[in-house]
Amino acid sequence: MATIKRLAIYDMDGTIVDSSHRYRTIVDANGERIDLDYWRENEYRAMQDGLLPMYEQYRSDLSDESCYVIIATARVMNAPDWQFVKEILGEPDYFISRTEGDSQSGKTLKINGLAKFFNLQNFKKADAVFYEDNVSYLKAVCDRFNIRGVYIPSKQGH
């Protein structure tokens, strides 16, 4: 295994994957948020998701032996999602996702999933970058691990 010089962490939806055709928001007393019922009703359409411009950087990082690539998504991954990852997106070195019934916040999910990497010797000197379209998640993860963040503007960052 090559020496790990870089750690690239990618959110999926709105960052490298365009799943907007099955995404919508609702507004309630707490503000605007993703309509999870609609999202779940349309999860079978994952193979119709598209790729966003940041995907080119993701593919470049996947081909770089000195870069360890992680996807950290708040999605519950089902068969169509995994098919999309395997056949279209390309599999990262590690994958963090929500399990069915998990209701913790996306930022907590991502922080807990990433914590072990920042304690491993292999990653101590790696230059880490987190690509995310949700400002709250981006700030929480970058502040927790003292890493660089790249905000990706999207309409899916709720």
Describe every region a protein language model picked out.
Residues 59-63, 118, 142:
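Surface-exposed amphipathic alpha-helices with a cationic face
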Residues 2-104:
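Alpha-helical substrate-recognition element adjacent to the catalytic core
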Residues 49, 55-56, 105-106, 113, ...:
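General structural signal for secondary-structure boundaries
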Residues 22, 26-27, 95, 124, ...:
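Generic marker of "main functional regions" within proteins
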Residues 30-31, 50, 119-122, 146:
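Short, flexible coil/linker elements and helix-boundary hinge sites characteristic
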Residues 125-158:
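Acidic, Mg2+-coordinating phosphoryl-transfer loop and its flanking beta/alpha structural elements
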Residues 77-128, 137, 143:
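Substrate-recognition "cap/lid" segment bordering the active-site pocket of phosphatases
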